Each structure stands twice: as structure tokens, then as C-alpha cells.
Regions:
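TRNA-recognition modules of translation machinery and tRNA-sensing kinases, especially anticodon-binding
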Residues: 1-107
Length: 107
């Protein structure tokens, strides 16, 4: 672990053994992200700053063409996913609310 300009930078000398994608290897070695489980990632301080900068650039470009940003809920009605044909995906996390309505974790 290194401190660079007051930021925690937990770099790794070796790429994770299970890493297949070059981007995965590089981001872990650079101390940008840490995998905490299958498909679960933690943004480390330097990585979160990069994420915020990229988001700002995308936001500027959207504004420049007159676009509008929106935010959708992470938990969505399953009907949206059924209509798009994506509801039957095996890995999709499905749940039910207290009234029995089908929902999907859209994350």
C-alpha cells in the first residue's frame, strides 16, 4: 500500500490469478478497484476519482447536445424486463414485494 498525495493507493504487484480481462488485471494492480465477490466490486479512492471524472465528461457531452440525464430505480417492475425479453436470463436477480408483485434488481 502506498500513500500518494494523501490518497490511499493499495497497488498490487501481481494480477489476480482468476483475472481474465486485461482491464480487470490493470485496474486491480493500479489500485482502482477491489473485487469483493463474484461480480461485486469496490471502488477504491483513486478509482472512484477516475469514475467521477469520466462521469463529468459524459455529463458535459450530454449537455452539449441538449440531452437530459435521468436516474432509474435499481429495483424495477419485472414487466419491463418481460417486455424486453430479458426476464428469462438465469443470472437475473428476481424478488417479490410484500403484495406479491414481481420485481427485478436492475443494478
Amino acid at each position: 500500500m502506498t500513500r500518494l498525495s494523501g490518497y490511499l493507493l493499495p497497488t498490487e504487484k501481481e494480477a489476480p490469478a482468476d483475472a481474465e480481462a486485461i482491464s480487470h488485471k490493470l485496474m486491480v494492480r493500479a489500485g482502482l478497484v477491489r473485487q469483493v465477490g463474484s461480480g461485486l466490486w469496490t471502488w477504491l479512492p483513486a478509482g472512484w476519482r477516475v469514475h467521477q471524472r469520466v462521469t463529468a465528461i459524459v455529463r458535459e457531452e450530454i449537455d452539449a447536445i441538449g440531452g437530459q440525464e435521468m436516474l432509474m430505480p435499481v429495483i424495477q417492475p419485472a414487466e419491463l424486463w418481460r417486455r424486453s425479453g430479458r426476464y428469462e436470463i438465469e443470472e437475473l436477480f428476481k424478488l417479490e414485494d410484500r403484495r406479491g408483485a414481481d420485481l427485478v434488481l436492475a443494478g
